[in-house]
């Protein structure tokens, strides 16, 4: 049976503001819990007017306090910006506050423009090459494994708690899959970023998986854009907005927020742009609840996974809520 989860990037709608976007993320998490979604993850983006979620740890804490059962996590913390020790302590605090409900999703992407990376590293170089070593150290801190031979002998992360957050690595390449496998972590493939070749990447993760304190068996899931509506016409209107938003991002066109369908419906595109839009449709599933369910089940079969994480970006928050309600209805039938 397929389980459904949500990744929300706190998108700001054109004409709205970041405060509203963050409040809508919290409201969506509460609705997701009521609807029966398994996880609710929030993202990390910097120096962005369009995406308000810059500090997943803070947002997770608030969402966890406003919900009761749903797992809450990061999708993800961009670890190369930070000290593995500090991340371990942040997530131990979260786990201590809500035991058994916290997921620590990790990534190596910058999550923003180079100037933001420089600022996050106080003008120093962001060294993503150290990411595998950071994963090892983070694991030690989360599970009290730093002994007297560690570079910080016998260092433990506070608070000292009896449980640990579930660790997931996020990625869209074979390199990230191999690192997740070698670490014993869960692996979330970002189909919404890379719509091609993910099936083989997930199979590679499962083949190369090594049990560790992070997990005894492989845990694989796939994240994909989904836009679900009552009619095909409405779904395609939502799709047209996401088409434009993704294309604008590729072309470096600054957006004040996610536009409305009325703002993009008369757009014309060059042959090259039309090809890019068609290619980007491989990253998303658009349609009625019956159509979306059929394609999500096919995606689940292709990836050989029973968990799908859904990313939905719309101008109107009501359209997003409706999409998630219809999706859950489809899988309840």
UniProtKB/Swiss-Prot annotation:
Domain of life: Bacteria
Cellular component aspect of the GO annotation: cytosol
GO molecular function: oxidoreductase activity, acting on paired donors, with incorporation or reduction of molecular oxygen
One Pfam family, short name: Bac_luciferase
Family the entry assigns: To bacterial alkanal monooxygenase alpha and beta chains.
Entries under PANTHER family matching the protein: LUCIFERASE-LIKE MONOOXYGENASE
UniProt protein name: Uncharacterized protein YwcH
Source organism (scientific name): Bacillus subtilis (strain 168)
